[in-house]
């Protein structure tokens, strides 16, 4: 099955905007101080990991098929990788580079603001 981009576009844009606003708010909360490394992970890595974990779910195939034809929200796994691969900070946080599975060249990344 394929995701209907016409159906999900508005919510996909909202997901990207929300992720960017949350990331900016996280950095504002640091007040210029570096986030501590915890468990070997930087603050930015923990931020993106928490974002991804917030979308964890388990769906039955029938439910997923129904969602893809009637719900304006993309399935949860796409609500993670879709926005994150459009945020430059995600690349820096995890060292994502050309040739990596989810790499998207800068000129193809969506910019909301």
Regions found by a protein language model. Name each.
Residues 1-113:
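Zinc-dependent metallohydrolase catalytic domains
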